[in-house]
Amino acid sequence: MYVYLLGLYLGDGSISTFARGVYRLRITLDVKYPGIINMAVAAATEIRGRPAAVHPQGEDSCVNVSSYWKAWPCLFPQHGPGRKHQRRIVLTRWQEELAKRWPDELLRGLIHSDGCRFMNTGRGGWVCPRYSFVQASDDIRSIFCHACDLVGVRWTKSGQRTIYVSRKADVAKLDEFIGPKR
């Protein structure tokens, strides 16, 4: 569950200081996908050992999965001032080891936060499923691509921020452990 939560954190997560040395882990998710919200709550709850909470995020389309704990910066040492895409993001050695053992969980978290599976269409009426991952951080895109390499999935870049998985066999491989958002 940690590697999945790491993927969510790298995509749409943040850690902020709270009272008395406690930190708040917050993962912002779309309300259209209650299954992903439930998985995020389960992951944060399992790691923390206490129930995570779901709070509305300003507008009606998002919620924050939140958990308070002094240890969050230890588990996510990428925490720091500023936006993740404006600073260096590097996995620690122990995080790399976990990501190598469970690259599928890391990919699931990254896709659930900053990716999607959609039907690509073209001239002549052809339709085929495709995954995209859009992320402003070069470092996080690199982490995504490395995880794809670990599971044997080919990827391509499009523009500065988008990674696609388009080949039929590679999409089928991701479907084994990710699939459409729910």
What are these regions, as identified by a protein language model?
Residues 1-182:
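Internal intein/HINT superfamily modules and their associated LAGLIDADG
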